[in-house]
Amino acid sequence: ESLLELNGDEERLAKLFAELEFKPMKGSANKPQTKDKNKNLNQNADKPTETKKIDSNYETILTQKDMKIWAKKLDDCKVFAIDTETDSLDTVTANLVGISLSDKEGEGCYLPIGHQYEGCPKQLDLKSVVDIIGSSVEKNRHKAVGQNLKFDIPILLRHGIALDSFHADTMLMSYVLNSTATRHGMDKLAMYYLNYETVKYSDVTGTASKQINFSSVEIDVASHYAAEDADITLRLFNKLDSLLAEKPIQKKLLQDIEYPLVHVLSRVEQNGAKIDKNKLSDHSIELSEKIEKLSSEAFKICLLY
């Protein structure tokens, strides 16, 4: 009998779930309980069945002339998105394969630098990219928007472009705005906030045993994928920025804590952290003593009941 289903206090549950931000549970607290054996099969029924299509104009940059045009665009725009493509996720050793930019929604470009495959066309040399695009990015760094810039900043720095400040990071904007609404990768954010299904990394590189390195992806395929990344990042920024405008506390948290930490954590990841072994050992002993004391107190409390 103790396993029988009991009626809950739905009103109190709803208030508690709202206070603790248990959003999926909050909705279920006000719904009558049913014994639908198939309810788990329909858990995504409230998600949009059709995704939005967007107009886009993406281009591959292969000449200094076109690079200068985009450098001017960065000078003239109010905000721009930047993203890097690499041959590895290790920021210490990864090589830069290309850079993508977007200065307005629907517009984007890709600058291929390090693709390697048979029949690969001539690409931009790194020095000219740093001299033309890099100098413009550095000059306009206060306009720069990215998605997880903690990855891009050290990659760019190792290849000669110092993005030592930036305007916004959409991953952090999403997390601060609502940490539990969705995962904070770009693909998930695009679906959640823009109702748009992006081209996935696996769509261009393949999966499992057939997966290839991004440097082996043909430039025309890589170009659309990368330029879309920058375009969607800019669209996400515009959306999230409008939502955060109504939440001054979260916006202050972003500016005062989250964004400065990006550079701190990036430096720690690149350079490591110096640790005082003696202090660490002493602290370990102190924590062990506290754990033992709390454990003893917990057992005493249990014996009382």
Q: What are the residue ranges of the model-derived segments?
A:
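Short amphipathic alpha-helical segments with heptad-repeat character
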Residues: A227-A230, L234, S281, I285-S288, ...
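Accessory alpha-helical DNA-binding modules that contact the DNA backbone or grooves
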Residues: E1, Q33, I285-I301
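Generic beta-strand/beta-sheet core signal
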Residues: I82-E85, S102-K104, P112-G114, Q147-N148, ...
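Short His/Asp/Glu-rich catalytic/ion-coordination signatures at enzyme active sites or charged loops
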Residues: E1-R12, F214-V217, L261-S288
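Long, highly charged low-complexity segments
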Residues: S2-I99, I113-E118, K122-S136
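Conserved small/polar residues in nucleotide/adenosyl-binding loops
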Residues: L303-Y305
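Active-site-proximal helix-loop-helix substrate-binding element of RNase H-like nuclease domains
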Residues: E50-Y58, D90, A94-E246, Q255-Y259, ...
